[in-house]
Amino acid sequence: MSGDNVRKMVTCTKTSGEFEKGYPDTIIIHYTAGPYQSSLNTLVNPKVKASAHVLIDRDGSITQLVPFNEIAWHAGESSYGGRSGYNKYSIGIEIVNSGPLTKSGNVYRSWFGAAYNPSDVVEAIHRNQSTAKYWHVYTAEQIETVRQLCLELMEAYPNIKQILGHEEVAPTRKTDPGPAFPLDTLREQLLGSDRKSDGAAQLPETGRVAAKTLNIRNSPESDGQLVAQPLPKGTMVSIVSEQNGWYKVRTTVEGWVFGKYLDIN
């Protein structure tokens, strides 16, 4: 890979050789659960049985570790869609992000002790969980780099038809990339969506709940039936469609919310 977003190439020997013919056909998105340098050290450490194809820093820059035509060790024990062992099917993208955070006074802390301000945090419900937690936000630069990289990979490897989270191929043990990453929106953009045609007005991609709580309903009207518990303030949602000031959104559930109470990204 080449271009302005590539910081450097780092040699990583932790591969299982080249993909078989017809693969890769999947991209898997991860968070590092740690800062850039320690994550890079882990990924290249020969004593650690983990690697990835690329590592994306907070500024959107890319470090490539494993060639895209070779199998990296990022998915681990994994299964999805009737297949298991996703390393042999997929390209692994690691994004520098601390994952779940714990509130401590006026700041939020990662498992390794880093402190974050409220502006770096979103409260949201994970797709595999039922209660809201605090999560480290991704930067706009990271999200755009991931989008552009996925486009390039899909062009280079036309068999790629899936973009998955680690949380989807290993739901009982992994939570990355988590609800702070707009995974569903990315899939809609790159793999086809139910949005309007190109000639229609551009919908915003994501939003955050601005009210203390926000009802999510089965129809775009104030007397629509509630489909889940109200979304707490800060919840990030993927926007699917719009109708008369209401947005159809997706988190762990799908439903309609009144657009007035969303901060649009």
Q: What label would you give each PLM region?
A:
Residues 157-173:
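Acidic/histidine-rich, metal-coordinating catalytic segments
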Residues 251-265:
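Boundary regions of SH3-family modules and the immediately adjacent low-complexity/disordered segments
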Residues 171-200:
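Short, low-complexity, polybasic intrinsically disordered segments
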Residues 2-159:
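Active-site-adjacent loop/helix surface patches within enzyme catalytic domains
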Residues 234, 247-251:
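SH3/SH3-like beta-barrel fold
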Residues 220-226:
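Short alpha-helix capping/helix-loop boundary micro-motifs
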